[in-house]
Design a protein with these regions (language model features):
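Active-site loop/oxyanion-hole signature of alpha/beta-hydrolase fold enzymes
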Residues: 17, 66-108, 291
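Conserved HGGG/HGGXW glycine-rich cap/lid loop of the alpha/beta-hydrolase fold
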Residues: 23-74
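Gly/Ala-rich beta-loop-alpha elbow adjacent to hydrolase catalytic centers
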Residues: 109-113, 117
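Flexible "cap/lid" loop of the alpha/beta hydrolase fold
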Residues: 122, 129-170
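Alpha/beta-hydrolase
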Residues: 165-251
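Conserved loop-alpha-helix segment in the C-terminal half of the alpha/beta-hydrolase fold
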Residues: 235-277
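Catalytic histidine-centered segment of alpha/beta-hydrolase-like enzymes
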Residues: 274-286
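Post-His helix in hydrolase/transferase enzymes
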Residues: 283-295
Length: 303
């Protein structure tokens, strides 16, 4: 099986404060509730198509990648840190409203982008009618019983990313690498090839392909997860927030599962988890994630 991303009805670029640009792709129903959809660290939004394709018939879906990811041209210096990502998100929000007009909007974010959306909403401002957070790498404050588990988790990811291979002769090479990994064993059929296509770009020197998100940029974000001091209550946001974690009880589940369950309970969130999933739940069990998405949006008059 091979996924084919439909051509967007509209594209536009959002210029960022340092000259970087984010390429926005509009899909679906332009008259529907607007749903910006994006990705986690080192990944790319097109790879989440098994999830967001189910939204196209009803919603105005805006697909985009954060700086130095996906369809965006990497910049030097990279300015690849959470404070910058939050400011970038504000630019995306404001430019989208300016170009496409105001519209009821629910942001859908995963992992790094979910953490960015939390920081943006708490520190810059609430810009949504609702916010959906899929398995953000929520690190409790020091002294919390789960802090150490998240510290170990993020440090392991940081070291892994630093040693990650960055160049490939073909898309197939990375596809096979994904297929050989235990961590990707639950991805839906066709996802390994889709992910490889989404995260690679042609090497500027014309020799094969390279990761759009350089390993050092990916590693920096994992390391910064431990520095944010961001463990907010749901009441600190300016509107409804849905927190959806991976399975906290799953054998071998990442530390994000128990951490998000703890935040959900302690912070008074509308919290759910998707049974039998790891961190990439939207591409492991997209149908269940869509069910939770539509349920939450409907609850707040957005579906």
């Amino acid at each position: 099986m091979q996924f084919e991303i439909p051509a967007p009805s509209t594209t536009f670029e959002v210029p960022l404060e340092d000259g970087a640009r984010i390429r926005m792709r509009r899909h679906g129903n332009p008259d529907g509730v607007r749903l910006p959809v994006t990705h986690g660290n080192g990944f790319a939004a097109d790879a989440y198509f098994p999830y967001w394709r189910h939204l196209l018939s009803k919603f105005d879906v805006l697909v985009f990648d954060f700086r130095n990811h996906g369809q965006n041209v990497p910049v030097v210096p990279s300015n690849h840190h959470y404070a910058q990502l939050a400011r970038d998100l504000e630019r995306v929000v404001q430019d989208t409203k300016s170009k496409l007009g105001p519209r009821k909007t629910a942001g859908i974010f995963h992992s790094m982008s979910a953490r960015t959306a939390m920081k943006h909403a708490i520190e810059i401002g609430w810009r949504w009618d609702a916010l959906m957070l899929f398995d953000p790498p929520d690190v409790p404050l020091k002294g919390h019983p789960l802090y150490e588990a998240m510290e170990i988790f993020e440090n392991k990811l940081t070291e892994w990313a630093k040693g990650r291979r960055r160049r490939f002769a073909s898309v197939d090479e990375l596809t096979e690498e994904y297929k050989q990994s235990r961590a990707t064993g639950r991805w839906v059929a066709g996802e390994h090839e889709l992910m490889a296509r989404a995260v690679l770009r042609r090497s500027p020197d014309g020799s094969g392909y390279e990761l759009t998100c350089a390993p050092e940029n990916e590693a920096a974000i994992y390391a910064q997860a431990l520095t944010l001091d961001l463990w907010p209550k749901a009441s600190e946001f300016g509107g409804p927030v849905k927190l959806i974690g991976c399975d906290p009880n799953f054998k071998g589940a990442p530390a994000t599962g128990p951490a998000n369950q703890a935040l959900g309970i302690e912070g008074g969130y509308d919290y759910s988890f998707v049974e039998g999933t790891g961190h990439l739940l939207q591409i492991e069990k997209p149908d269940e994630c869509i069910r939770l998405t539509l349920e939450f949006l409907g609850k707040h008059g957005l579906a």
